[in-house]
Amino acid sequence: MQSIQTVSENTIYVGASDRRLAKFENLFPIPRGVSYNAYVILDEKTALLDTADASVGAQFLENVAAALDGRKLDYLIVDHMEPDHAAMIEAVLVRWPDLRLVVNAKTLPMLKMYFPTDGAAFDDALVVKAVSYTHLTLPTN
C-alpha cells in the first residue's frame, strides 16, 4: 500500500520507514527506527531526489509510482552513494529506463562500479560540477 505525503504544491515525500534497526550506523540508538527520505518533484519535468534502502524497496517503488500518478520520471538526482540513499538506483532505472541521472563528478565512477550495466544510463548522466555561491547580506531593520 502506497504511503506518500505532500510536502508542498510540487514536492511529495516518497520515502519509507524502517523500524527493524536498533542503531543507526550500528552506533547511535534509534528507538523509533529510521526513515529513508526521498522526494518526487513535479513540474514541467519530474525528478526523484534520492532512492532508499533495499529493505523498503517495494514500498519505495510503489510510493514513487503513486506520486508520479502516470507521469514519466525524467530525472533521478543521486545525492550520494550510501546504501540507504542509493540501493534502489538500479530498480528505478529498470522501472523508468528513459530517465536521466543527475550526479556529481565523484558519484559517476561509483555508479559504474556498483551497478554494472551496458553503460547507457550512465553515459547520458548530467554531471553537476562545482557550484559557486554569492554571499548576500540582508538588511536588518
Task: Name the predicted role of every residue range.
Residues 44, 55-102:
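Active-site metal-binding motif and surrounding structural segment of the metallo-beta-lactamase
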Residues 11, 125-126:
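Short, conserved active-site loop motifs that form the nucleotide-linked donor/cofactor pocket
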Residues 4-66:
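Conserved beta-strand hairpin/beta-sheet module of binuclear metal-dependent hydrolase folds
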Residues 86-112, 116-122, 128:
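A generic, well-ordered mixed alpha/beta core segment in the N-terminal half of proteins
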Residues 134-140:
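Conserved small/polar residues in nucleotide/adenosyl-binding loops
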